[in-house]
C-alpha cells in the first residue's frame, strides 16, 4: 500500500547563523534600530546585532572599533530562534555606554517604550524579557 502514496522529501537542514546581540544602554535607555523595509523581519525594531560570535573581549573590541564608548560590558543569556529556513543561535551582551553615539541610526527607548511603542520581533524575546524583568 505504501508504494501508492508519494514519499515526502526529507527536510534539508536549516541554515545556522551565529549572532551576537548587544543590549546597548545609555542613561537608563536602550538603543534600538529599525530593520530594513524588505527581507526577514522587515520594518520591525531590533537590538544591535552582528552575524558573528564573540567572546567578552572580542565583543568589547568590536564595539570600540565601531565608535561605541563602552563603560561596562557583561555577558548575557544565549538565545535561539527558529525560522522556517534559518536557525539563529545568539549570544548576548549587556553594554553600558559612556556616550550616546550621535548620527548612528539608533533610537533611545525606555523599558516602557520598548514594551508599548516599538515592535520587537519574537526572535529577540529572550533579550527583551531580560530588560523588562
Which residue ranges define each predicted feature?
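Intrinsically disordered, low-complexity, charged terminal extensions of DNA damage-control enzymes
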Residues: 1-133
Amino acid at each position: 500500500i505504501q508504494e501508492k502514496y508519494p514519499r515526502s522529501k526529507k527536510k534539508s537542514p536549516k541554515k545556522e547563523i551565529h549572532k551576537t546581540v548587544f543590549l546597548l544602554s545609555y542613561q537608563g535607555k536602550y538603543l534600538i534600530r529599525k530593520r530594513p523595509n524588505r527581507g526577514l523581519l522587515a520594518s520591525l525594531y531590533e537590538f544591535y546585532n552582528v552575524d558573528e560570535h564573540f567572546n567578552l573581549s572580542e565583543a568589547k573590541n568590536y564595539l570600540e572599533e565601531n565608535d561605541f564608548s563602552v563603560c561596562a560590558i557583561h555577558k548575557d543569556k544565549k538565545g535561539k530562534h527558529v525560522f522556517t529556513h534559518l536557525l539563529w543561535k545568539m549570544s548576548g551582551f549587556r553594554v553600558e555606554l559612556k556616550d550616546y553615539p550621535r548620527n548612528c541610526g539608533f533610537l533611545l527607548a525606555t523599558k516602557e517604550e520598548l514594551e508599548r511603542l516599538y515592535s520587537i520581533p519574537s526572535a529577540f524575546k529572550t533579550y527583551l524579557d531580560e530588560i523588562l524583568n
